[in-house]
Amino acid sequence: MRCAPTAGAALVLCAATAGLLSAQGRPAQPEPPRFASWDEMNLLAHGLLQLGHGLREHVERTRGQLGALERRMAACGNACQGPKGTDPKDRVPEGQAPETLQSLQTQLKAQNSKIQQLFQKVAQQQRYLSKQNLRIQNLQSQIDLLTPTHLDNGVDKTSRGKRLPKMAQLIGLTPNATRLHRPPRDCQELFQEGERHSGLFQIQPLGSPPFLVNCEMTSDGGWTVIQRRLNGSVDFNQSWEAYKDGFGDPQGEFWLGLEKMHSITGDRGSQLAVQLQDWDGNAKLLQFPIHLGGEDTAYSLQLTEPTANELGATNVSPNGLSLPFSTWDQDHDLRGDLNCAKSLSGGWWFGTCSHSNLNGQYFHSIPRQRQQRKKGIFWKTWKGRYYPLQATTLLIQPMEATAAS
């Protein structure tokens, strides 16, 4: 039995993916994102295709040999028993027949075992191909998002457009393959599919077009990052439309966008994680259940006690007490005599202006003037009303994931 094509294909795949497999065995290290080149992805896809062809040929050859063994066993059985009226002298000697049958049965069991192993390998490779297809889609989306505008014209764009069909052909994808593999609904669904590395991924909530998000994979599952403040590189004093659509750098400071957040949470209850950090390196993690309304509710954050009291929510909603979102040009806060977003800075779920504001002005050091400090990033119940925080991150996850963990 020849297995050279399969072994050769496996060597090609091993050579192409050795770095990837070794990285999966170690905890992910924080390092600048590196996107695989098209040549590397072509080599990986070619190795996968060659391995798949080799396994398929090996299975077909094994099936043929199995059929031959079955025919030999049938012939042996007929020869051992002999038809009625056959001269006993023409039959296989009694001492030899059991040995022949036992030998054939041993070979048959061995072949069956090999076939089962091959089927498992083929199924494993199919799952791996599907996962690689998703990775390639994510890489394409990342390149489209992060490539400078001047590289997105002319030769570079045309060359990239020509390479995509070639990649799909190498890994055996049809033009409609992406429809068969819908992007995950959120980072938790991506986690359930086996992804364990944090980073940028494409998701597609129900009823929404696909878009890129930052996923943080933890032992508790996949969390979708919806906000990050860390260095003041992005101005968060934005309009209602900007907060609705999202802004910033997905690899740095950013706001995902209220409409995207609402599409992720949908009608499901979600868990909101709030990560806070002060200027002395101290950190605080808060988690509480939320519902997020649509634009018709001013994207109200619907809370239950005691969190509602902590954030100053007093409006009654079907899911508890609610806080509508406000910006300088869309005032929905609970202060009738003041626009909190104008008085402070940034858009936020303001109560009476004094409970929290994680989208406030970023200070690289704590200002001396109290009037200036109140415009900063603060969470009153942790560091007080006039302490501007150094860094914050907001993450969401569906409630069913929290209940299952």
Swiss-Prot record:
Keywords on record: Angiogenesis, Coiled coil, Disulfide bond, Extracellular matrix, Glycoprotein, Lipid metabolism, Secreted, Signal
Pfam family, one: Fibrinogen_C
Taxonomic superkingdom: Eukaryota
Main location per the UniProt record: secreted
UniProt PTM comment: N-glycosylated.
CDD domains noted in UniProt: FReD
GO MF, one example: lipase binding
Cell compartment(s), UniProt: Secreted; Secreted, Extracellular space, Extracellular matrix
Disulfide bonds: 187-215, 340-353
UniProt keyword Repeat, yes or no: no
Segments forming domain Fibrinogen C-terminal: 178-400
SUPFAM superfamilies associated with the record: Fibrinogen C-terminal domain-like
Coiled coil: 54-146
Site (Cleavage): 163-164
SMART domains reported in the protein's UniProt record: FBG (SM00186)
Database matches in InterPro entries: FIB_ANG-like (IPR037579), Fibrinogen-like_C (IPR036056), Fibrinogen_a/b/g_C_1 (IPR014716), Fibrinogen_a/b/g_C_dom (IPR002181), Fibrinogen_CS (IPR020837)
BP-aspect Gene Ontology terms: angiogenesis; blood coagulation; endothelial cell apoptotic process; lipid metabolic process; negative regulation of apoptotic process; negative regulation of endothelial cell apoptotic process; negative regulation of fatty acid biosynthetic process; negative regulation of very-low-density lipoprotein particle remodeling
Keyword Coiled coil appears in the UniProt entry: yes
Positions annotated with a glycan in the UniProt record: 176, 231, 237
Signal peptide boundaries: 1-23
Function: Mediates inactivation of the lipoprotein lipase LPL, and thereby plays a role in the regulation of triglyceride clearance from the blood serum and in lipid metabolism. May also play a role in regulating glucose homeostasis and insulin sensitivity. Inhibits proliferation, migration, and tubule formation of endothelial cells and reduces vascular leakage.
Subunit structure: Homooligomer; disulfide-linked via Cys residues in the N-terminal part of the protein. The homooligomer undergoes proteolytic processing to release its carboxyl fibrinogen-like domain, which circulates as a monomer. The homooligomer unprocessed form is able to interact with the extracellular matrix.
Listed name of the protein: Angiopoietin-related protein 4
Organism whose genome encodes this protein: Rattus norvegicus (Rat)
